[in-house]
Amino acid sequence: MTLLGAAQIRELAAALDLKPSKSLGQNFVIDSNVCTKIVRTAAVGPTDIALEIGPGLGSLTLALLDSAASVVAVEIDSRLAGQLPITVANHFEHPENLTVLNQDALSIQSLPVNPTVLVANLPYNVSVPVLLHLLEKFGSLRTGVVMVQAEVADRLAAKPGTKEYGIPSVKAAWWAEVKGAGSVSRSVFWPAPNVDSKLVSFTRRQTPGDEVLRRKVFTIIDAAFAQRRKMLRSALSGLYGSSSSAEEILKRADIDPTLRGEALEISSFCAIAAVAPDIF
């Protein structure tokens, strides 16, 4: 196995006449050591089926193939999706272990196999929606490590009561425990992004309820953080008709109506949903 370095990445891009697209969030990892670190952090093993989103020119893909049983790579850019199998065949002795899907990760509803681990340099402009979509649709994903913008990583891994805690934190917690997993230098990307990057890891946990409850809980979360400085009785008044109605529901859920959304864990939002009327 030969991993790709900066020179090979630039050569591949030149051969494709590829200019990295800002709209697609294309910042390619050019440091093979970082790719190896990400795969190691994700603890990818020989029985794992790895799901990679936005494989780009294949630097992380090759590192994954070196550790996993197989890799499913989802790439929205048709040029990159077409080149990736060729690149892998030139650098890896078992190219059949790679499946490439030329699709938008946000629209994927099924995969040819059930992935067990997500490892990806997620497009920064859609990283949270993509992560939440994958956690929702693919229950076989037990663990994962993703690279995202530093501020997004902090929000995903934030705990109640912190300034970073918000909608991404609580919604991700419905499916998984999310933790920070280290920083990544801008210098490992081409082109270098204008923002800092971090890794976050997740471990799947038992969800608090079914899909009906999830949609109800997520609606409450959205309302609670729409104006995050408002007390919950005010923030939820739009959902339940008035502040007094919201206060009554909160008291039934054993939640202090004067708290703000940023103080509540996912279990507290579930408690509110359990006693609140349906809002669909």
Where are these regions (language model features)?
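Catalytic cores of RNA-modifying enzymes
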Residues: 1-223, 251, 262, 271-274, ...
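Active-site-proximal catalytic alpha-helix in oxidoreductases
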Residues: 226
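Catalytic core of IPPT-family isopentenyl/dimethylallyl transferases
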Residues: 255-268
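Short helix-coil junctions and helix-kink-helix linkers
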Residues: 237-239
